[in-house]
Amino acid sequence: MHESHLVVILALLLLALWCLSTRPVQPSCHVEINGHSIIVTGNCWHSTQRPH
């Protein structure tokens, strides 16, 4: 069953769209897929941390 791969791909697409929507000025969120390893670079994670 390759459903797990489809779920991962959909999750990456949603993450990419969300990162682009949260930072429309500087879309520096980059996602690479090498085999089964997922590499996420950029300041995408910094934009998700909001001070309470």
From Swiss-Prot:
Provide GO CC annotations from the record: host cell endoplasmic reticulum membrane; membrane
Signal sequence region: none
One annotated GO biological process = transport of virus in host, cell to cell
Q: What is this protein called?
A: Movement protein TGBp3
Q: Which residues cross the membrane?
A: 4-21
| Major site of localization recorded for this protein | host cell
Pfam families reported for this sequence: TGBp3
Q: Which UniProt keywords apply?
A: Host endoplasmic reticulum, Host membrane, Membrane, Transmembrane, Transmembrane helix, Transport, Viral movement protein
Keyword Lipoprotein assigned: no
The UniProt function text for this chain reads:
Plays a role in viral cell-to-cell propagation, by facilitating genome transport to neighboring plant cells through plasmosdesmata. May induce the formation of granular vesicles derived from the Endoplasmic reticulum, which align on actin filaments.
Give the Cytoplasmic compartment stretches of this protein.
22-52
What more the UniProt record tells us is: TGBp1, TGBp2 and TGBp3 seem to act together for cell-to-cell propagation. TGBp1 is the main movement protein that physically cross the plasmodesma with the viral genome. TGBp2 and TGBp3 would facilitate TGBp1 function.
Indicate where this protein resides in the cell: Host endoplasmic reticulum membrane
| UniProt similarity note | Belongs to the Tymovirales TGBp3 protein family.
Topological domains annotated Lumenal: 1-3
UniProt keyword Translocase, yes or no: no
